[in-house]
Amino acid sequence: MQRHRFYAPPAQITNASITLGNDESHHLARVLRLLPGAVVFAFDGEGNEYECEVAQINKTKTELNVIAQLSDEVESPLQLTLGQALIKSDKFDWVVQKATELGVTRIVPLITEHSEFRKADGREQRLQRWRRIALEATKQCGRRKLPEISDVQNFQQFCEQQTAGQRLIFSERGGSGIASLATAATISIAIGPEGGWSKAEIDLANAQGYIALSLGNRILRTETAALAALALVQYQLGDLP
């Protein structure tokens, strides 16, 4: 049986009821054509999810009655930050979607020496699109926490801000194998653009304490590398069976 999931931020939730906003209400009533009495699920993006019954539907909002709060754990125990160099729009969209499904905590779009970045692009529009993609992926995969999609940063800013836990840079030019990764609960992963990292960027990462890791002898597309790196780190640290 399909589970219909809806997003309601904490401000829309009380102990006994949940109010869905306009977009979620439209999807519930006009797309799914659910009626009062239907059982649905609502999550707050911060780790909580509730089984609910549809109580009332009107043009701009839907009222849900809370039946029970779910207690099973679905989130990753790891705090995973993915610094992904900017690439073509559709490929970056795909990385956001799949990284969300895998359980990433935060995604940081990076400007690097070889990244595809045009200042004329609407930065705010891109951020809003990536956040919508992350929300839809969160609904689909059963997560309860929305990943943070940060504003665009340059690579130096990213390196200087990531100070906790393991800091990893995946490079096509050498690096240790994933088996050398030490246990940690907080991990930052840097993935370069299609043109690769420059020598200056590798030197910067090394100076900031980043460990260079390899994804093997074959050259991967950057979007493939991002997902492979996340999955391997999760497997190595016990997040994947």
Regions found by a protein language model. Give the residues of each.
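Generic structural signal for residues in well-ordered beta-strands
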Residues: 64, 146-150, 212
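Glycine/charged-rich beta-loop-alpha catalytic/anionic-binding loops adjacent to active sites
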Residues: 18-20, 77-81, 185-188, 207-215
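N-terminal positively charged helical leader segments and presequences
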Residues: 1-72
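RNA substrate-binding interface of SAM-dependent RNA methyltransferases
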Residues: 73-167
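Active-site/ligand-binding-proximal alpha/beta "capping" segment
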Residues: 162-202, 210-213
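Structured adenosyl-cofactor binding patch, chiefly the S-adenosyl-L-methionine
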Residues: 199-241
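Short, ordered loop/turn segments at secondary-structure junctions
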Residues: 11, 69, 111-115, 217-218
